[in-house]
Amino acid sequence: MPLSYLDKNPVIDSKKHALRKKLFLSCAYFGLSLACLSSNAWASVEPLSVNGNKIYAGEKAKSFAGNSLFWSNNGWGGEKFYTADTVASLKKDWKSSIVRAAMGVQESGGYLQDPAGNKAKVERVVDAAIANDMYAIIGWHSHSAENNRSEAIRFFQEMARKYGNKPNVIYEIYNEPLQVSWSNTIKPYAEAVISAIRAIDPDNLIIVGTPSWSQNVDEASRDPINAKNIAYTLHFYAGTHGESLRNKARQALNNGIALFVTEWGTVNADGNGGVNQTETDAWVTFMRDNNISNANWALNDKNEGASTYYPDSKNLTESGKKVKSIIQSWPYKAGSAASATTDPSTDTTTDTTVDEPTTTDTPATADCANANVYPNWVSKDWAGGQPTHNEAGQSIVYKGNLYTANWYTASVPGSDSSWTQVGSCN
């Protein structure tokens, strides 16, 4: 968020390790029933990697949508949402794939004043995101991060040691730089922090802020960072930013860098005003068309247009209703969109790595009479669109066999671990 807000491409650069999916099963090893699978199966998120100007999840360019929390600063009001319950609700009710922990740094009540308290808030969110098969953005929420480079390095080293083996975690090392030089100020800071992270975590996605409140992505694209799995921040507010900023984004994409919208709003850039429906829809189309992942600002109940909730309530604002609909209908979902948990320590399930389609040892005869036949999908991305995929628990027939989706999938039935073969239709 701008400071004024405070005053009120190529060869796929995939993970070194093979892509794995984790299924957490509360039933017996592979003798599982469909009911068990749909209610207790867990798919860990796919690792993210940068390929040219796209971010890949596994081996396919995808984008995900979710929510940004408000500043974590003590006493600012948004910290009450830094809970496992909040994250689980986003997963279950919103079908969110991303949650962003916006850890305030220099301002009152932020990390520099209370490092332990703010770090604990971030870790609660990250731990809950991992438990709920979501991506978690660890955000250094600063407008002048170059002034605290050593603190940023120490913080992200600690985060990398704790979470570097989790594909869920994304490092956002600079929120919104002011009107400062990319090449002389932001880039040197970013290179130092990236180097420190990469010494511990060689491959998780790192996002770097860009000049002028993360709008001048075109400037960064002309002098990109020479490191792998780096994306660049684009922020917009639909009431303020329109086609001219999208043109900057197009130029950056044409120059070969990947973008990630870690913060966006339906209203004005100062957080006030009503929802700009036309520009919000234009931005959503732009992000979907270009596979740009995004997190909406802000899951909060402050008395302003950008907030998800009205003050001291769980009633959705105009913006909250709009954003929830956008996230729920986003074409790609992380992990299992159908389940959520608030306390992973109470989970008594068995952790089983599955690298291929899940099948029973001897598929039984299945009732296929009422099932769609591939490629006649069951679910739509948009209410008025054509069916494009299956959601968790939805079945489809392919080559005489009945398959059920374990999570959101548009792959060929039986071709990967997003499917379970229920039985033969013969």
From Swiss-Prot:
Region annotated Linker, chain positions: 333-366
One Pfam family hit: CBM_5_12_2
Record-linked Gene3D superfamilies: Carbohydrate-binding module superfamily 5/12, Glycosidases
Gene Ontology annotations of biological process type: cellulose catabolic process
Disulphide bond pairs: 368-425
Active site, UniProt feature: 176, 263
Signal sequence bounds: 1-43
Result for mutant: residue 141 to A: Loss of activity
Catalytic reactions of this protein: Endohydrolysis of (1->4)-beta-D-glucosidic linkages in cellulose, lichenin and cereal beta-D-glucans
InterPro entries cross-referenced by the UniProt entry: CBM5/12, CBM_5_12_2, CBM_sf_5/12, Glyco_hydro_5, Glyco_hydro_5_CS, Glycoside_hydrolase_SF
UniProt-recorded Gene Ontology molecular function terms: carbohydrate binding; cellulase activity
Main location: secreted
Cellular component, GO annotation: extracellular region
Name of protein: Endoglucanase Z
Species of the source: Dickeya dadantii (strain 3937)
